[in-house]
Design a protein with these regions (language model features):
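Conserved GTP-binding G-domain of TRAFAC-class P-loop NTPases and closely related GTPase folds
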Residues: 2-7, 17, 21, 34, ...
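Conserved Rossmann-like nucleotide-binding pocket used by diverse enzymes
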Residues: 19, 40, 82-83
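Conserved SAM/SAH-binding loop
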Residues: 24
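Conserved glycine(s) of the Walker
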Residues: 27
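Conserved substrate/cofactor phosphate-moiety recognition/catalytic segment
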Residues: 30-77, 118-120
Length: 181
């Protein structure tokens, strides 16, 4: 498999966290595995050798595990990371990743995958849950605007860091498969 290195930003390279987000079945895991760094995602916590079936209860436990593991790796190990998950909004897991990256001095690259036009979810997510995910999913511009506008949750210093060190890229799933396949 052809591994990609994380992009560098600026003269002095900061450690990076790559967030790969998108709807279930969009190819997040496939793309995340292509980066040459530690790969963490919710599926790793939930599966433990079984076929992964999404459920709100399992998802809650997995999100907490992911946040704890990412924070530990950022603070203790200071290594490049890639994390894959749905992460529809700025104020959930993605917001905590931003806050931890700010505290640890990380550069953040967010890749948002579009919905795969030819594939059903590989995780047997119910259609009503997929509809809810679609409704919740913020665009990259909406995430950026929400973070920069929220003066109560985010300090001015954080918002300056966010503007300089968080980078967004929208990728159609089949494009990533062709480019990286």
């Amino acid at each position: 498999m052809n591994k990609q290195t994380l992009p560098t930003a600026g003269r002095r390279r900061r450690p990076c966290v790559q967030i790969v987000r998108g709807l279930p079945g969009s190819g997040k895991s496939t793309l995340a595995r292509r980066f040459d760094c530690l790969h963490l995602e919710l599926d790793q916590r939930v599966t433990s050798g079984r076929i992964y079936r999404w459920s709100p209860k399992a998802d809650k436990v997995a999100h907490q595990w992911l946040k704890n593991e990412l924070y530990r790796k950022m603070v203790d190990d200071r290594i490049d990371l890639v994390v894959a998950g749905v992460m529809p909004r700025h104020d959930g897991t993605m917001g905590e990743i931003f806050a931890n990256a700010f505290d640890a001095g990380y550069e953040v690259f967010v890749k948002t995958l579009g919905e795969h036009p030819f594939r059903e979810s590989v995780h047997d997510v119910r259609p009503c849950d997929m509809a809810r995910f679609r409704k919740l999913m913020m665009t990259d511009d909406e995430v950026r605007e929400a973070v920069l506008a929220d003066e109560t949750a985010y300090s001015a210093k954080f918002r300056r860091w966010f503007t300089a060190h968080v980078h967004f890229d929208f990728v159609m799933p089949f494009e990533s498969e062709v480019r990286n396949g």
